[in-house]
Amino acid sequence: MKPELKTNDFIRVKGARENNLKNVNIDIPKNQFVVITGLSGSGKSSLAFNTIYAEGRRRYLESLSSYARQFLGNSDKPDVDSIEGLSPAISIDQKTTSHNPRSTVGTVTEIYDYLRLLWARIGIPFCPNGHGAIQTQTVNQIANQIFNLPVKSRIQILAPTIKNQRGTFANEFAKYQQLGFLRVWVDGQVYTLDEEIKLDKNTKHNLSVVVDRIVINQDKQTLGRIVDAIEGVIKLTEGRIEVLLEDGKILSFNKNHGCDQCGFSISELEPRLFSFNSPLGSCEYCKGLGFSYEPDVEKIIPNPLLSINEGGIDIFKNIVHGTSLDWQRFLSLINHYQIPLDQPLGQMDTDLVRMILEGSDEPIEIKTVSNSGAKNVRFEHYEGVAHLIKRRHLETSSQASREWYSAYMSEITCKKCQGKKLTTNSLSVKLGGLDIISFTELSIDKAIEFLLQIELNQEQKKIGELALKEIINRLSFLKNVGLEYLNLARRASTLSGGEAQRIRLATQIGSQLTGVLYVLDEPSIGLHQKDNDRLINTMMVMRDLGNTLLVVEHDSETMLAADYLIDIGPKAGNQGGEVVAAGTPLEVMENPDSLTGQYLSGKKQIEVPKTRHAGNGRTLTLKGAKGNNLKNINVTIPLNKLVLVTGVSGSGKSTLINQTLVPILERLVNYKNVKPAPYKEIIGVNHIDKVVVVSQDPIGRTPRSNPATYVSVFDDIRELFANTKEAKARGYTNSRFSFNVAGGRCDKCFGDGVIRIEMHFLPDVYVTCEMCDGKKYNPQTLEVKYLGKSIFDVLQMSCQEAYDFFKAIPNIARKLKLLCDVGLEYLQLGLNVTFLSGGEAQRIKLAKFLQKKATGKTLYVLDEPSTGLHIEDINKLLTVIQRIIKNGDSVIIIEHNLDIIKMADYIIDLGPEGGEKGGQIIAQGTPEQLLNQVDKSYTAQYLAKILK
């Protein structure tokens, strides 16, 4: 039910001028579902995020103390006259949640915290040796196990009172002394209580009281002392007992949980026991990661058909027979064992290959000569290429070096915990037959089903009722935003931007806040049309709680479902920044000035091609693909066609293309050292001579990187400036106009235009350079003009302005035209690329690749290119893609957008659902052929609605 709008219940924005906004005045209704749309670069994000959200955050920060503000960073006032009626604002964007390998869907949503509580309170410990559920142990049972240790063993019976806690514990030491104890065991060392024990209060410590020291003898007196000691321990620890053996090992017992057959015991169940971030619960070997980075033989020797001389050992391929010390040491191994340098490594004796990788079994003579000519001879074990890589990866302090060695390593599942991250004790606790990690490996759908059907006794129900309810609610929120195919163990760093955003959205629903302004950035990204209705309903629920939703979106269904629609335009960049239309979706559709309205009403649309591309008759066939959830599938991809890979979220599209097909081709065609997901074979690689992956990854990391430098048009522009009369008279070359080398650039900021101020524990702050006023060049360089414009003036131009300016210079105009063709005419040539969205970065890459001559054997791969694109922009992008096909090359696109899908020459639809229920090809063919498969394919069902 849409809430009734009250009088004056608006967010009133007056005079917004942030970025390209042109003094925008607008009243946005509060407690409504409001969508802001418009062409890419028209100013949507400038209004929603850079103005409204930024001001909301700034006001919140100003309400905090100066002490608190220093940890949250500064927030400048946006360029706006006033904003009235602003609520507390929360931004939910598309940034990946976390790059920390410990961060999972479960930890991000805090569901794992509730699970730890549930397993600790109502979980049942089981003996890992198959002796069934563990019952409480009596004092006599524990005493008998200790009594049966080898005769003459010297043991100390300890009462573990402090575990992983910070402090000096002076009061505790005094208390133990008063109770008559003589010794304590602290962090592996025994102290007497009459000496001064100094501990660092900021370090975590383990502390146990030495209750008795006993020599094991098979007599009643010894057994009696053990019983007395155990009873003394229990008074201090509520059941936890430790026995320190002579070799330093510790045996743990618990009066509450212990196996009466084999003596296995587990400490008191507490939430920390199930945390892979706590020393108490994490696997000792992998420290709770579930994996370790180890050298990968397939990456070290990517092509076993090559010999060592031919570069078969990838890390040595550029230093074969050189003077590098690494090669000289390796050559000592070669000479000692007479390893053939010209024999393919795949045909070499396995023992020799093992020694190359793992090192020599014996000390050998290793000869080296330094650059200065100094000779060195040593007898030692050769460490092996694999060990060399691992050691250097651990020892280096250089990020570049670490990335270099990482290229030869892979994540290997931990052998101790088998990837489960926790200790044996933690994993022995079951609920409904599952340990906590096995539960997190269930899909969201199955997890909900499991909890609804779990059988608990009355006591368990009473204790776990609230935690169970909270877990089921939060899992349901994730399901309602279309993420039922995910599992709680999924690493946050592997989530797409859309998935991460919807997880944050689900978390906010769980918080049940009211009176909040939520600002969202394209939440429909990565979502199949089938799941879109659920997402819209979820946002409606948030609105009905009494919140305002301000959503930047291009999806037609979302726009039509909005209470209020704002169209920013009329075009992009300097030609945008105005409110073209605002009102209900119907009112916007009736507004002749609104391009969005024309598309929504059907007056304007992307026309379905009358004929599909015939292709060149060649195909690429992948057999036996079974990575992640793929069900050993075979797929044939026709070449010289536009091929769309579709399917519901989590159906296996990215696994099939990005993790299997692309790495195979990059390895075989581009000769990259990458490892594909499991597959059987690939046929037709000879039809491909180049693979171009147009991803949404950032294209640069420094303020000097910009669109002009990335597409290489800046080289031509610098050459043009260097050929002006003024430049020649001064003796300037094209390097004078570069901000990457000294000479023409500003000497203070080194061509960045900004000065970076390191804030140590806070994010770095960038301030405009005072010397050049952000212009990057020194005054002398800026005096050189071409048609009245300096090099800085050119960098300030949009791509369209620059194209018009340089129209008479073919090599410059051609590159700028490509940027305009992919819908980036609004983009400033000198814009810092770190400010680009993923969609913009992807289109800049496409413009760069399109400069190269078509080979007829190039395969382009794009992943959701519609991200951030208005329907008009999609039309432009499709024109460029059609040009690629006409030039004889091939294009594969992973996409949910129906306007792109309907233009396909061939569709491969995966499903039928996401996660374990996906991974199969359920429909394939032309869009028209898919209409005959609507009973199997969700994509076909939605395609049928727009093709009729």
From Swiss-Prot:
Transmembrane segments: none annotated. GO terms for molecular function: ATP binding; ATP hydrolysis activity; DNA binding; excinuclease ABC activity; zinc ion binding. It comes from the Bacteria. Gene3D superfamilies: ABC transporter ATPase domain-like (1.10.8.280), ABC transporter ATPase like domain (1.20.1580.10), ATP-grasp fold, A domain (3.30.1490.20), P-loop containing nucleotide triphosphate hydrolases (3.40.50.300). PROSITE patterns: ABC_TRANSPORTER_1, ABC_TRANSPORTER_2. Keywords: ATP-binding, Cytoplasm, DNA damage, DNA excision, DNA repair, DNA-binding, Excision nuclease, Metal-binding, Nucleotide-binding, Repeat, SOS response, Zinc, Zinc-finger. It is found in: Cytoplasm. A zinc finger (C4-type) spans 259-286, 746-772. ATP 1 binds at residues 38-45. It holds the Pfam family UvrA_inter. GO terms for cellular component: cytoplasm; excinuclease repair complex. Residues 316-595, 615-944 form the ABC transporter domain. Signal peptide: none annotated. GO terms for biological process: nucleotide-excision repair; SOS response. ATP 2 binds at residues 647-654. NCBIfam families: PRK00349.1, uvra. The UvrABC repair system catalyzes the recognition and processing of DNA lesions. UvrA is an ATPase and a DNA-binding protein. A damage recognition complex composed of 2 UvrA and 2 UvrB subunits scans DNA for abnormalities. When the presence of a lesion has been verified by UvrB, the UvrA molecules dissociate. Forms a heterotetramer with UvrB during the search for lesions. Belongs to the ABC transporter superfamily. UvrA family. This is UvrABC system protein A. The lineage of its organism: Bacteria, Bacillati, Mycoplasmatota, Mycoplasmoidales, Mycoplasmoidaceae. The gene is uvrA.
